[in-house]
């Protein structure tokens, strides 16, 4: 059946029907900064929506490549964005369930001959109809170890990425330099990953905002002086090894809460007000080892 060139579809109506803006608004609300990442997600959502409308009018085109690569440091929102991406894919009908399964090498690779295939296939079975997020994916490939079984897991993933791409989306994640090397060593994998999104590190000011949000969610607050101390802490921590962006800020806040509790406990019989219980004072942060160096 031919369709007239005058046949119309309503882009805005379909966009609203699928409630894509709702997911994008959640992304804006849940993640501070990351403007380049949010822009890429919106671009992908637009492509998927237009492709869906083309299909409604019988226009021929291959399904857009949906497998993705998220690169960046720990704590930059990769898992959160993967969750939102799974939701978008579900709302637009590209996956059946829209759930996210997060795994690492240990979930896929066995320790002896014959162990890897069943492990990998079991994970894939759970992920079908949704999105499989493989964190630190480069650990799957260990070229220096001939007895490593990671290559077997990669081969199974390759087959599924090609043969069942209409029922599963795979997102590979990790540090950018290591992921680049991983793709160079596995060209078959690289050719099947169409969307590469780089997650920048947060600025100190963005991390301060994130820290304040984390505290507000737990009904704590910072004084003006405490805000300045936390900002100083973040700037110092960023220069230290194993800095993990929002995760490092969360750890700092957890320790500050513990110091606050001990400070009040050690004060003896003092009657505490609600303000005492919710306020993180500068001293609760200044006792960090970073300020003693």
UniProtKB/Swiss-Prot annotation:
GO cellular component annotations of the record: chloroplast
Principal location class: plastid
Gene3D superfamilies hit by this protein: 1.10.8.60, P-loop containing nucleotide triphosphate hydrolases
Signal peptide location: none
Keywords: ATP-binding, Chloroplast, Nucleotide-binding, Plastid
Binding residues annotated for ATP, in chain numbering: 72-79
Record-linked InterPro entries: AAA+_ATPase, AAA_lid_6, ATPase_AAA_core, CbxX/CfqX_mono, CbxX/CfxQ, CbxX/CfxQ_RuBisCO_ESX, P-loop_NTPase
Subcellular location: Plastid, Chloroplast
Gene Ontology molecular function: any one: ATP hydrolysis activity
PANTHER family linked to this entry: AAA-TYPE ATPASE FAMILY PROTEIN / ANKYRIN REPEAT FAMILY PROTEIN, AAA-TYPE ATPASE FAMILY PROTEIN _ ANKYRIN REPEAT FAMILY PROTEIN
Entry's family note: Belongs to the CbxX/CfxQ family.
Function: Necessary for the expression of RuBisCO.
This protein's name: Protein CfxQ homolog
Organism from which the protein derives: Guillardia theta (Cryptophyte)
